[in-house]
Structure formats: C-alpha cells, structure tokens
Amino acid sequence: MANSFERIYAVVKKIPRGTVATYGQVALLAGNPRWARVVGYALHANPDPEGIPCYRVVTKDGRTSPAFAFGGADIQRALLEADGIEFTEDGRVDMAKYGWTGLG
C-alpha cells in the first residue's frame, strides 16, 4: 500500500494552484482507476500537508470532503479560496472552470 500512496502523492503534488482534481482522476493518473477510496485513505494519512496539497482533491461533483483530515470541510474550502477558487451558491467547485486536466 505504501507504494500506492507514494504514487498518489506524486500525482497530487502536480495539481497546480487554482485547480482541483477528483479522487477518481487522481486514482486514474496514479495507475489504477479503481483506487478512488485508496486516494482518500492516502490523503487522510498525508505525511506532508504543506508539500502534498491534498486539499486540492474534491469529489466528482466538486464538493469538499466532509472528512478533510486537516481541519474539516470549512478549512478545505478556505484553502481552495486562498488558491483563487470560487464556489457556486450550493457550495461546489465548478469543475468545468477549475478542474485540472492532468496535463502539465
């Protein structure tokens, strides 16, 4: 599992400021599209929150995680807003606008 986590962390480190990725997208880019839950476990165990920006990972519909390991959904939202990401009226990230393509 440790090797899986390292692959996940490598992907998350690439998510640029001002964009977000989904759990499923990180799983796919880490090598296994069925790892969405593993991505969640890895992010919860993140050994370096400042170096691995796990707050940039959201659900497929743009929602923050209610179980965000480093302070809850409100902290995750504040971190994303500090990155320049805006939220819709219903509290979601506009994935068409802020979703990372995984390229570059």
Model segments located where?
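Nucleic acid-binding interface residues in structured DNA/RNA-binding domains
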Residues: 1-104
